[in-house]
Amino acid sequence: MTTGRLSMAEILEIFTATGQHPLKFTAYDGSTAGQDDATLGLDLRTPRGATYLATAPGELGLARAYVSGDLQAHGVHPGDPYELLKTLTERVDFKRPSARVLANVVRSIGVEHILPIAPPPQEARPRWRRMANGLLHSKTRDAEAIHHHYDVSNNFYEWVLGPSMTYTCAVFPNAEASLEQAQENKYRLIFEKLRLEPGDRLLDVGCGWGGMVRYAARRGVRVIGATLSAEQAKWGQKAVEDEGLSDLAQVRHSDYRDVAETGFDAVSSIGLTEHIGVKNYPFYFGFLKSKLRTGGLLLNHCITRHDNRSTSFAGGFTDRYVFPDGELTGSGRITTEIQQVGLEVLHEENFRHHYAMTLRDWCGNLVEHWDDAVAEVGLPTAKVWGLYMAASRVAFERNNLQLHHVLATKVDPRGDDSLPLRPWWQP
């Protein structure tokens, strides 16, 4: 296969697999490869798709070809290609072909088809070209990165996330619980971990559509939520007003760094740390500490790597199509950085299985509302979401990604915290 002229199906096979596998590959030149009776497969439909595969070998080239419609998946719904991705991950060895094999691919495709071409319009610019928006994790560049992902369409998010409009890991009280029950349970758990009582003050940074803001306000807590997404802030503030919670809560369109108020009884960060940048953790956690009164509590909820050695930067697909400038590290690094700013870490736990279940339900919602979603954001963007959520589900199931809660407190100079000796919340 690696010395003679290759068919297009064989080229597709090279870029996705090695050895025996349960997939069927077909291509626009009429060629086939793989297992004939396989229920799952990939179809390379155009020469442009071959160009994407050859000029960006690996996940980015595959994503470009898939999002553009030049590569089609069979046996799965585009809103939830989980079974295909799981099969590829578990039974196929993804690889970057050797230089010798790539040279043969070039000869087979033809030199005219290996010159770089424009990626799909859904793709963000590479990191080096984002300098026009400011330095990495500057306020202007962070705002643009958040806009790329979170300002897609509130209607679209309502279809995918469901009534809770909560775009973070749910906490399932049991395997049979619905997504809505699990999201409500997550807010309940965070509320209890933070020991909030009526009249207390909470700052929720990266508040999204205000789910935690409204939950806490319903229980009598005064809350400020801050989000960089204009669409989220508009939706969240309206939801606050519609529930009659304006006397207690507000959702601001604001960088968390622009919150001037201090002396909060608690700070929650639910899904923001992923956007901060690892090098900025000292400032970030120091800033959150500065917002707390002495004795106040911080709950940091974020996606992490499974170890503390892997690179913090996202892969090509995630960085270009999902979370531009997003960075992840291990829970050990998160805990260390929280301790380094002088906060005392009280408790930590991992919810990775819960995130896999959350993503399962989000994909189910996307499939259910597929026609509406495509009409709202277009087929390529809808496919990006199905691909990214299903791939993330596989990553959490395989322990490549985790979701951690870290609870910490701002002790007084003598080390007093006035906290119970044992955990005070219901699991």
UniProtKB/Swiss-Prot annotation:
Keyword DNA-binding: no
InterPro entries found in the cross-reference section: CFA/CMAS, CMAS, SAM-dependent_MTases_sf
Binding-site list for S-adenosyl-L-methionine: 167-168, 202-210, 227-232
Cellular component terms (Gene Ontology): peptidoglycan-based cell wall; plasma membrane
Superkingdom of origin organism: Bacteria
Keyword Membrane in record: no
E.C. no: 2.1.1.-
Protein name: Probable fatty acid methyltransferase Rv3720
Gene Ontology terms describing biological process: lipid biosynthetic process; methylation
Similarity comment text for this entry: Belongs to the CFA/CMAS family.
A single GO molecular function term of this UniProt record: cyclopropane-fatty-acyl-phospholipid synthase activity
Keywords linked to the UniProt accession: Lipid biosynthesis, Lipid metabolism, Methyltransferase, S-adenosyl-L-methionine, Transferase
Function: May be a S-adenosylmethionine-dependent methyltransferase involved in fatty acid metabolism.
One Pfam family in the UniProt entry: CMAS
